[in-house]
Amino acid sequence: MIKLYNFKTRGLGVITTEALTKGFFIGSYMKKNINQSSNSRLIYNGWVETNPLGRYINHNRNPNTFIKEIGDSLNLISSQKLDAYSELTINYLDVAKILKIPQSRLKELGVDDYDYIEEEIDKVINLI
């Protein structure tokens, strides 16, 4: 369903190997396994390792996936219909907000577009 792909201009990312419908479940991670130190890894690498490929999902301000939190599970869901061989993207700042990562920690990681977090997070919350 997904595989690692080396984009010549952007490096590694994850693509679909088949078409996915809007709302398609891609993978999940148990939130209880995320501790403070792995939070920074999540933001740095993107998505937590739902499988070995999950960490390569790239950031995009207009992502085609989102996180749906159900109990202790963080589920990666397609937010739109995707053609086969589409790159999967996630908004790292939305993930940071869901995990309640402090702005000070984001700043240490070089993420400083806080106004964007506040403007865009409502869109994700409405999808969940």
Regions from the PLM with identified roles:
Residues 1-128:
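Conserved catalytic SET/PR domain of SAM-dependent protein methyltransferases, capturing the structural core
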